[in-house]
Amino acid sequence: MTKEQKLQLAEIRTMIPEMRRVECIHFVGIGGAGMSGIAEVLLNEGYHISGSDMAENTVTVRLAQKGAEIFFGHQASNVAKASVVVVSTAIDPSNPEIVAAKENRIPVIRRAEMLAELMRYRHGIAVAGTHGKTTTTALTTQIYSEAGLDPTFVNGGLVKNAGTNARLGSSRFLIAEADESDASFLHLQPMVSIVTNIEADHMDTYGGDFETLKQTFIDFLHNLPFYGQAVMCVDDPVVRELLPQVSRQVITYGFSDDADVRLINYRQVGQQSFFTVQRKDRTDLDIVLNIPGKHNALNATAAIAVATEEDVEDEAILTALLNFEGAGRRFDQLGEFETGNGSAMLVDDYGHHPTEVDVTIKAARAGWAEKRLVMIFQPHRYSRTRDLYDDFANVLDNVDVLIMLDVYSAGETPIAGADGRALCRTIRGRGKIDPVFVPTIEALPPVLANIIQEGDLILTQGAGDVGKLAKQLASMELNIETMKKLG
């Protein structure tokens, strides 16, 4: 970091003089993607950071190397030095660290409240929506970085070009993923808000009422100052429906004829996307985006719309998108590997909603039409499987071979008829494909060994621990005997 950048950073920190009274910030569940990002930014700002989690992972290792104090397991003594305790909604209120903090009158705040403090005196760009948040945040970060704007960013997944999910920049810009799953994005007060799309998800947060979810997005947009900007995907029917209710400047984007920033002439060749972006009063941009799928072209167009308003030079936009390496676990190509039955391509994807699974399948088909598509799908949460059961069945039978794992519960209690086995039976009953149910990841390798063929595209899909399986498969010699031994 240059001397000038250090001075800019010092200036940013002095904008929040009251925060200087905070000596130690403790994170309960520090190993999670959203929590670790904020922790890393604060650590780099010079705060003492401590945190706890149940097990070590790559994130906790990195934070420890940077100077954070990491505890494994949750106990009251972990918060002894804390000036404030940061929690996510995934943490049970009976957690001993939360109980101890409250008993000792240590403030306990939600993750989004701390993110809001980071954003308070910066030019915040918040990326919201049911799908595409992580990739759009990464794309916007890539463009701003290429333009030399050195943004701070906090993302829900790895920004591959940066090698991390969060970084402290020296400029006034902060680009952050805004989480609607617990409505905590209402704490944020950005200057620019992107809304990629709105669908029914996390409905328990909203009392099962879709109208409440829609109103929450409107409230989020009205956290913008009157001079702020809402960048909204007009292709999404719910977003379009809400446009008249948004009392801030709106910039629309999408394939639609009436979009302010319009995407045309899309085509995909292998992993790359080619398209043109038309902008009012600006020259058209012929884009080469280094990730596949129409959905990612839309995500890139959102980032272009924001960058255009900031007068980022076109060359920086073009270069950033051409060199974009993607976001972690978003159509993550882990390479070709050799098996006893031949060579196969391995792709890992985080998508766990029917819409996300659908666009991933379409991207795979568009780029690798000649390959047999073998999906290993792990449903995420019983409630989501129940609420979107028919949608999952409609989407999942569009692959050639489906291997179904049981539900990754994420702490939920099982719901009868909303599990992997039931979903498998429903899909089989339609007669299009004959899915294979495998109850656990540990039982999968020998099953997979008997299924893989030369030229297959193997897609591990889901938000649970199926991603760990993908890394395991990518890191070993996948001969048949090895896989059978794994079983």
Swiss-Prot record:
Principal subcellular localisation of the protein: cytoplasm
The protein's Enzyme Commission number: 6.3.2.8
Subcellular location(s) of the protein: Cytoplasm
UniProt keyword annotations, A-Z: ATP-binding, Cell cycle, Cell division, Cell shape, Cell wall biogenesis/degradation, Cytoplasm, Ligase, Nucleotide-binding, Peptidoglycan synthesis
Binding-site residues, ATP: G129, T130, H131, G132, K133, T134, T135
Superkingdom per UniProt: Bacteria
Catalytic activity annotation: UDP-N-acetyl-alpha-D-muramate + L-alanine + ATP = UDP-N-acetyl-alpha-D-muramoyl-L-alanine + ADP + phosphate + H(+)
Example GO BP: peptidoglycan biosynthetic process
A GO MF term: UDP-N-acetylmuramate-L-alanine ligase activity
Gene Ontology cellular component list: cytoplasm
Bridged cysteine pairs (disulfide): none
Involved pathway(s): Cell wall biogenesis; peptidoglycan biosynthesis
HAMAP family according to UniProt: MurC (MF_00046)
Family: Belongs to the MurCDEF family.
The protein's role, per its UniProt record: Cell wall formation.
Protein name: UDP-N-acetylmuramate--L-alanine ligase
Species, as recorded: Aliivibrio fischeri (strain ATCC 700601 / ES114)
Organism ancestry: Bacteria, Pseudomonadati, Pseudomonadota, Gammaproteobacteria, Vibrionales
Gene name, Swiss-Prot/TrEMBL: murC
